[in-house]
Amino acid sequence: VRSSAASDVYKRQVKELREMTGAGMMDCKKALTETNGDMDAAVDVLKKSGAAKMEKKQSRIAAEGIARVAVNGNVAVVAEVNSETDFVAKNETFQEFVQTVADTALASDLNGGANGEDIEALLATNGLSDLLVEKTATIGEKLSVRRFAKVTGDAVASYIHGGGRIGVVIAADGASDDAAKEALCL
C-alpha cells in the first residue's frame, strides 16, 4: 500500500514519463513499476516495448499518408510517409514526424528514391529510426517512410496539394525562383 505522498510522487512520475515519451498511461505505469521508479530505466523499457510493438505491426499495410517538402536555398526535398489510416495522416504528431523526415533528408547527402538502401540510410541519420519506433508506439499504427526525392538547381519551388496527399518539387537551371514557380503555376 502506498502512502498518499508516495502516491502523489508516483502520479507525477507517470505524468512526466508520458510527457517525455508520448506513451500511454498504462505503459508508463508498467515501466515505472518494472524499474522501481527509475525514470531513465523506464524510458529504456518503453523504447524496447515500442520496438516490439513496431515489429508486430510490420505485416500491416500502410497505404495512407502524406507528403511534406523542405527547401533550403537551391535544394528541395519531398518526402512521403505512410500510415494505416487517413485519420492518423491528419494527426498533428504524424504530420510533424513527416516534416522531420523531409528536413532530415534535406540535410543528408542522400538523393532519395523509393529504393530500400536510401530509405535505410535516411532512417540511420540523426536517430530517425528511433523516432520512427517512438512515433509508431505513440500513434499505434504502422508508419513507413515510403520515398523521398531531392532536387538541386539554380531555382527551386515546391507545392503541396490536397492536404498533403500530393507533393511536388521542381528545380530549374538557368532560371530564377519566379520562373520555377511559374512552371508550377503558383
Which functions belong to the PLM regions below?
Residues 11-186:
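N-terminal assembly/interaction segments in proteins that build large macromolecular machines
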Residues 1-6, 10:
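Single conserved hydrophobic/aromatic residue that forms the stacking wall/gate
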